């Protein structure tokens, strides 16, 4: 008599996507959970495929390096929408809490043109928890505390309103406001950060029409610089202070003509407003950045090995800057305004 046999497998934390024509890897939630606390910038600590380094240790600015090049050569995406560009790029890796992420896709080298033209050495795409998925948590929370006085709190709740409608609310709080000066040189070793982050998203999953939308709000205060004098100096301490407010909105609309061939027409819209007031000693740099992105896309699959996509895209950035790069506080602020509008069209087979 043959008894019952259970075959159990566990999905690997990092997988090479062999079905993709690009050099693409996926970091799943199993790999992300190995870090007790993390944001996007810290989630690659357990994974050697991506190198994250400080571009400015005094303020905590980080950058991702792929194929030996870093910074603007790597395109950041959130659910395949270009994000954290311009003024948000130095600290954007800290704007994505780890518990919010479902997976990360890392593409090295030439990437798909569907998401823009800015990927020179690769793309980093973050997929968040989605309320429409069957495995979505109804409610979850986690707390973190460290010996360095870093505290984090994360919570998310999902509500299935009907068979087709669902919504989720995600919240994050981070506090690391104690100054650390391990080598006693008078300067803090890491910036002191306090961050509030809230995101509400909605989803409608119809037979042919699919809709997603979300709104995100972030407030962050970041301080660094001198903690005390190391000699008999009595002058003002050199302080760095960066206050940020950021708001994002996105919507995805898709009409599916043929599910078997994945034939669909999609419209993606997103907008963000980023306000940053920065002080570096007596120098000031304040910037308001407005971004609008739109993409109209058609896709179809002929078979498992052949697919076609074509579309139109538009990206608009506006920067309103006020700055003083001299140490004389009596000097007026310099005003500068810049904008960039980039329309585009593409086809990919």
Locate the predicted segments by residue.
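Extracytoplasmic beta-strand/coil segments of soluble accessory domains associated
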Residues: 24, 41-82
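Flexible loop and strand-edge segments within Gram-negative outer membrane beta-barrel domains
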Residues: 176-197, 205-265, 271-289
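Outer-membrane beta-barrel transmembrane domain signature of Gram-negative proteins
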Residues: 238-259, 265, 273-349
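N-terminal periplasmic accessory domains that precede
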Residues: 40-43, 62-65, 77, 92-97, ...
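Short acidic/polar hinge/loop motifs at secondary-structure boundaries
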Residues: 63, 81-109, 198
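Transmembrane beta-barrel strands of outer-membrane/channel proteins
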Residues: 141-145, 169-175, 213-217, 267-273, ...
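N-terminal periplasmic "start-of-domain" segments of outer-membrane beta-barrel proteins
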Residues: 5-35, 63
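Predominantly transmembrane beta-strands of Gram-negative outer membrane beta-barrel pores used
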Residues: 75, 103-107, 123-129, 138-147, ...
């Amino acid at each position: 008599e043959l008894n019952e046999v259970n075959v159990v497998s566990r999905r690997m934390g990092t997988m090479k996507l062999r079905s993709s024509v690009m050099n693409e890897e996926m970091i799943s939630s199993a790999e992300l959970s190995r870090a007790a606390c993390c944001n996007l910038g810290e989630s690659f600590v357990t994974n050697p495929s991506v190198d994250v380094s400080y571009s400015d240790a005094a303020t905590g600015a980080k950058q991702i390096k792929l194929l030996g090049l870093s910074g603007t050569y790597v395109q950041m995406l959130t659910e395949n929408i270009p994000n954290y560009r311009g003024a948000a790029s130095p600290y954007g890796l800290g704007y994505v809490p780890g518990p919010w992420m479902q997976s990360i896709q890392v593409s090295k080298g030439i990437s798909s043109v569907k998401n823009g033209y800015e990927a020179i050495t690769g793309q980093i795409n973050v997929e968040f928890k989605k309320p429409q998925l069957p495995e979505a948590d109804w409610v979850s929370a986690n707390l973190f505390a460290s010996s360095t006085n870093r505290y984090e709190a994360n919570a998310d709740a999902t509500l299935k309103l009907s068979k087709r409608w669902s919504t989720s609310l995600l919240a994050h709080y981070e506090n690391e406001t104690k100054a650390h000066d391990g080598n006693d040189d008078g300067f803090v070793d890491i910036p002191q950060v306090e961050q509030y982050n809230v995101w509400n998203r909605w989803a409608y999953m119809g037979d042919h029409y699919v809709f997603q939308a979300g709104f995100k709000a972030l407030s962050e205060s970041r301080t660094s610089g001198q903690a005390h004098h190391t000699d008999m100096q009595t002058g003002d301490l050199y302080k760095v202070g960066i206050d940020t407010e950021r708001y994002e909105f996105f919507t995805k609309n898709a009409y599916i003509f043929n599910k078997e061939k994945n034939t669909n027409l999609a419209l993606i819209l997103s907008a963000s407003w980023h306000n940053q007031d920065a002080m570096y000693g007596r120098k000031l740099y304040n910037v308001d950045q407005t971004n609008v992105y739109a993409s109209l896309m058609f896709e179809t699959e002929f078979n498992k090995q052949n697919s076609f996509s074509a579309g139109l895209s538009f990206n608009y950035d506006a920067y309103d800057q006020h700055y003083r790069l001299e140490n004389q506080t009596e000097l007026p602020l310099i005003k500068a305004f810049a904008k960039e509008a980039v329309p585009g069209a593409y086809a990919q087979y």
